[in-house]
From Swiss-Prot:
It comes from Cuscuta gronovii. Residues 252-273, 279-298 are annotated as: Disordered. It is found in: Plastid. Pathway: Lipid metabolism; malonyl-CoA biosynthesis; malonyl-CoA from acetyl-CoA: step 1/1. Zn(2+) binds at residues 136, 139, 155, 158. The gene is accD. The keyword ATP-binding applies. This is Acetyl-coenzyme A carboxylase carboxyl transferase subunit beta. Residues 284-298 have a biased composition (Acidic residues). Component of the acetyl coenzyme A carboxylase (ACC) complex. Biotin carboxylase (BC) catalyzes the carboxylation of biotin on its carrier protein (BCCP) and then the CO(2) group is transferred by the transcarboxylase to acetyl-CoA to form malonyl-CoA. One of its GO terms (molecular function) is carboxyl- or carbamoyltransferase activity. PROSITE patterns: COA_CT_NTER.
Amino acid sequence: MQNWIDNSFQAEFEQESYFGSLGENSTNPSSGGDRYPEALIIRDITGKTSAIYFDITDDILENDPHQTILLSPIENDIWTEKDVIIDTYRYINELIFCDEKSQQKQKDRTEFIKKEQLQLISNRNPDHYRNLWNQCENCFIPNYKKVLKSNMQICEECGSYFKMTSSDRIDLLIDEGTWNPLDQDMVSLDSSEFDSEAELECYEDNIKEWNEEMCQAFMRKLSKDLKEGQALERTANLIEEPWLPEYIQPEEKVEEWTKPDLDEGEESQDEERWIWELDKGEESQEIEDSEANDEDDDDAPYVERLAFYKKETGLLDAVQTGVGQLNGRPVALGVMDFRFLAGSMGCVVGEKITRLIEYATNNLLPLIILSASGGARVHEGSLSLMQMAKISAALYDYQSNKRLFYISILTSPTTGGVTASFAMLGDIIITEPGTFVAFAGPRVVQQILNETIPEEEQEAEALFEKGFFDLIVPRHLLKNVISELLNLHAL
């Protein structure tokens, strides 16, 4: 703007300024016709003419240095050079400001339309079409599943990683046609009987038998130590009047004590039930409370949940193990699947991984395990925790005694007992960008320590700086990086 002013007005211009209507069919504003854009004409000494057009309705400014159309004379004779500079400067500033505002409005409108389109797509697509798409958790853009699989489960919009199934991981790493699964028919039979109803019924029967035996033992001891009259007298003193109607004789009540008869399944709510019935104890009450809680609990029994995830994922448990070739090199591979009960480690998972390690040990194969787990499986109790020690012991023999090569690959998320055992025991530990790795999640830590942990503190990039991993490898480079590591170790 300053250069234009210097070139236009400080070089001794001869100003001949006009306002007029342009075009062949232009109409003079004073004639009452349609108004066309107004123009300011400036001509220098050499005769070169510059025209500036002003469209008041659309706020458009144009500068035409080749304009030669004759215009009507200026209507205001008081118009000076200074006024021209000031007004021109003002108009240009206003138009620049309007342009910035319009760009911001256009940007906001574009974002709004984008959101509306996503919402429209979501509303229009019925349920039987939605399974064809996966929505990115980072940018919320839907990705077509077939394209997503060919793109290694990487979002086309923002490049963030989707969770991969165990089968997709195997296809990514193992050469086509070389995969041979191991122990694929091994299933869990609820070894801890976490939700066993038969065990609960047996426990109730034991409590009833125990109560009956205690009652009989009490009566035998009472009859042995005291004479019949003393027993009746002491018993009558123990019983309050509301419990002993006047028409019932004490002798009849004693006989009733010695012959308790409760129908199976009958609840004790009558105040006239005898003492042996009231002494069922806290354990029996806890069982009744647990039954009530189980009825109110929405979670299905463990056996039913296993059946559901088997049908949902097509897997028998949360890990696939086997042998195959990686760029022509034989390897033993174990891949956990987070879809099956959050990839939790139970007896089957621990046994399959242990057998895989033993197979690799006996056949002198390099071992690769990809972890994706929520930790030990609480449904199997201490048996699931024992898998940590069992796998670690097998790895000790594999690494220390046989001096073989174990690569641990951590995928998102890897937490709990898996992180505390074989996931962090690799000779080389690799992870993907943005992987969530922790022993306990932010919610658990906050409840225990009353401290809030930022999410990025438990991601791969932050943990890599603290020495948790050896490599952070993008997904599309993972196979070649593993192949190079195997070459370096002469395996």
